Amino acid sequence: MSITKAGLSSLYSRLLLVLAILLFSGALASANPVIYKAGNPSKGKKIVFVASDHEYRAEETLPALARILAVHHGFDCTVLFGLDGNGEIEAGASNIPGLEALKDADGMVIFTRFLALPVEQMKHIDDYLNRAGPVVGLRTSTHGFKYDDKRKNDPYYKYSFRYTGEDYSGGFGHQVLGQSWVGHYGRNHQQSTRIDIIPEKKNHPILKGVSKVHVHAGGYNAEAQKDWDILTMAQPLMTMKPDGADDKTKPPMASEWTRHYKGKNGKKGRVFTSLYGASEDILNAGYRRLI
């Protein structure tokens, strides 16, 4: 069996990405922050990555993306993880030291789920959103925060995905990303997803060079809103393979979009939301390019 030059290049890139994920798995990383300094030329911009979910391995996805953006695109990247009491990474932990890094950040990439951060930590996210900083939200960040009734008097209770107050209905997910938790679309961990570019959006800057997007994560329901600029549609497949047949019972559903949210005093912040982003998803070159 012969392997083409293009095939070797693709294999090499895949091995490098797998290595990056392994190096920064929860067993090895033990303290916040992990910092990747910008390669040359530097853009002079800083991105903060906030990782803490307990199912899709945000603690693997975000360091890999941060390193790519630093080495190949010239961004200074700071990755913050949920930590346990010993200072070691704990998937889904509601303890993320170092969030003060958001004070001078030019962008925030968030991948969290059901967090109830201490007031002194959540304040930094609140401050960032008040100044309408750009946000990229992945997968479970639509339900990234969850506060129980014991914390109803917490100043940041409104960020909970179940918040029903008229001042911030739907919490962080709805108010910032445009979508709160709705539910799975198909059988998660049994059906993978093909992501197709909407033809009319093929020239959008975010979609430059994006093709053949397949992700392992199962579909999420999306209730499209008028203020979404929808870029892609997700088609659930019958198998976990890229060539799996379409699930004919599941029409395509919006999967990536842009929008604006309102910070303090009505200032608008830019948002990109993806309903995917599991660590297996970024093994696909098309999805990595999309993010």
Regions found by a protein language model. Name each.
Residues 278-288:
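A short acidic/glycine-rich loop-to-helix N-cap element
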Residues 51, 231-233, 272-276:
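Active-site-proximal beta-strand elements of phosphoester/diester hydrolases
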Residues 33-35, 70, 75-76, 90-93, ...:
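Catalytic beta-strand/loop cores that center a nucleophilic Ser/Cys/Thr
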Residues 32-39, 46-145:
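Helical hinge/lid and interdomain linker segments adjacent to catalytic or ligand-binding clefts
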Residues 101, 110, 114-208:
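A glycine-rich, often tryptophan-bearing local segment used as a flexible ligand/cofactor-contacting loop or short
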Residues 14-27:
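Bacterial N-terminal signal peptides
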Residues 134-136, 229, 270:
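Proline-centered loop/turn at the N-terminus of a beta-strand
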Residues 1-17:
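Bacterial N-terminal signal peptides that target proteins for export
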